[in-house]
Amino acid sequence: AIAHVLYGGNTLLAHEVGAGKTFEMVASAMESKRLGLCQKSIFVVPNHLTEQWASEFLRLYPSANILVTTKKDFETHNRKKFCARIATGDYDAVIIGHSQFERIPISPERQERLLHQQIEEITDGIQDTKLAGGNSFTIKSLERTKKGLEARLKKLQASDRKDDVIYFEQLGVDRMFVDESDNYKNLFLYTKMRNVAGLSTTDAQKSSDMFSKCRYMDELTGGR
């Protein structure tokens, strides 16, 4: 599994509970750094498991330099300072809770670009569905999703751009590991395939945020 992460790129570790996913991810991160494949990894884990993850990390690599978030780090008056620590520190890894991770925004420019792409895909999808004689429920569902994305784009374009915000791209992380990634589901995905069970026609905000950050990581690694 570790070799697959190192040489195979994006990897899903779908072992049973207790089969060693934590150690596999930790070893993958440290070996990646040793081999020069990355400089700083970020581990996105359930909020209540950050300390446990830190303990397991140091059990495997006692001399590792890791940064672990606490609740106080993401209080309004501390968040910018903590993000600056991530960006400027020479850490082997940063361990952060799911909800804290979601509070580090992607840059507005990247958000806007992704929204434009999604709106274009859905517009094409609506047209394709109509030409193929698709059912009205699917068309209406796609149109609702398109309106929602257009509203998000309009809100983003109207918002003030703050100079003092540290965006995800500025953290200096170049490898990401997500524990219990099933928390990020219900991401909208348009496909020309029909009647595929489990595909959502609506978009969950936190899943969209994760998708944007994964796309950024893929840019750094050439899609791997």
What do these predicted ranges mean?
Residues A1-A14, Y184, M193, A197:
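Conserved pre-motif I regulatory segment
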Residues Y7-L13, Q39, D92, G223-R224:
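Pre-Walker A (Motif I) flank of P-loop NTPase domains
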Residues A19-C214, D218:
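SF2 helicase/translocase NTPase motor core
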